[in-house]
């Protein structure tokens, strides 16, 4: 019946919305930003940037794990990604506004891997996406899925040093 089909479609959509997305966030210019602020304020600057990233991802019920001083691993649901996409990844601008006397603004690169069969492949896609974001000069979000690449933000076209991009195809 039509009701059964409607109900089935609702379950399919809900299942799709709950799919996990792996992502990476890098502070593009960490060293330059740290050098541009007094030493006594460096830990505060890092804490403010950390807080912005944690709040932004936390607000969509995502998880953030700091991997290194300038690298973060994130996990979110597909419906959370839709919200970030709608607000055009406002975190990119929010982090640039963090100023406690630093003469250089911090910029971020965000890489997300979408619509994959496995979590491992989502992470591989996220790594390809972050490499592309860095190769294009940072300050942008790059989304990789099985259909291709989508870019948000980023004005500077440039090639990164020592960058090799490996194309990963789904089995």
Give the ranges of each region predicted by the language model:
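Alpha-helical scaffold within the catalytic cores of cyclic-nucleotide enzymes
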Residues: 50-61, 81-104, 123-132
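Catalytic NTP-binding/metal-coordinating core of nucleotidyl cyclase/transferase enzymes
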Residues: 17-72, 76-79
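A short glycine-enriched loop-to-beta-strand structural element that forms part of the catalytic core
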Residues: 63-75, 99-128, 138-146
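Sensory coupling linkers of modular signal transduction proteins
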Residues: 1-39, 135, 144-160
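Catalytic cores of large soluble enzymes that bind and process phosphate-bearing ligands
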Residues: 45, 83, 111, 118-121, ...
């Amino acid at each position: 019946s039509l009701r059964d089909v409607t109900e089935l479609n609702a379950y399919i959509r809900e299942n799709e919305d709950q799919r996990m997305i792996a992502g990476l966030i890098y502070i593009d210019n960490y060293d330059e930003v740290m050098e541009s602020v007094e030493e006594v304020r460096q830990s505060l600057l890092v804490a403010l940037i950390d807080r912005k990233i944690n709040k932004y991802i936390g607000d969509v019920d995502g998880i953030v794990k700091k991997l290194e001083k300038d690298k973060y691993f994130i996990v979110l649901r597909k419906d959370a990604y839709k919200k970030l996409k709608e607000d055009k990844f406002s975190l990119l601008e929010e982090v640039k506004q963090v100023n406690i006397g630093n003469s250089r603004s911090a910029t971020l690169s965000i890489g997300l891997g979408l619509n994959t069969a496995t979590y491992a492949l989502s992470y591989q896609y996220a790594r390809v996406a972050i490499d592309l974001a860095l190769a294009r000069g940072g300050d942008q979000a790059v989304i990789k899925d099985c259909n291709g690449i989508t870019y948000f933000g980023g004005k500077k076209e440039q090639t990164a040093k020592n960058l090799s991009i490996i194309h990963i195809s789904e089995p």
